[in-house]
């Protein structure tokens, strides 16, 4: 089942943000598209916060307590389980 997921993020320098919508049908595709989104829109090396939204479901994350310029691959293990729960709840 295909899901439309809205993504928003801001980057560490505080100078901007990115947003967009992806349409995916599996968690692996969601993870791949999320990573691509960060690379394209948020400058992967400086993600400060992000949120994903679908219907009434949402997941928000920030790295304000982490050193600046952490990329998503540095924190993926801590958010992957929560994102999978979010994705499965999204209709």
Feature names for model-found ranges:
Residues 2-16:
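Short aromatic-glycine-(Arg/Gly/Cys) micro-motifs in beta-strand/loop hairpins
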């Amino acid at each position: 089942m295909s899901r439309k997921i809205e993504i928003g993020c801001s980057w560490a320098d505080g100078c901007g943000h990115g947003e967009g919508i992806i349409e995916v049908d599996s968690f692996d595709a969601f993870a791949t598209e999320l990573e691509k989104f960060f690379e394209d829109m948020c400058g992967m090396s400086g993600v400060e916060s992000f949120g994903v939204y679908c219907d009434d479901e949402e997941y928000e994350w920030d790295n304000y307590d982490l050193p600046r310029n952490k990329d998503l691959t540095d924190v993926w293990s801590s958010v992957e389980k929560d994102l999978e729960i979010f994705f499965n709840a999204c209709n």
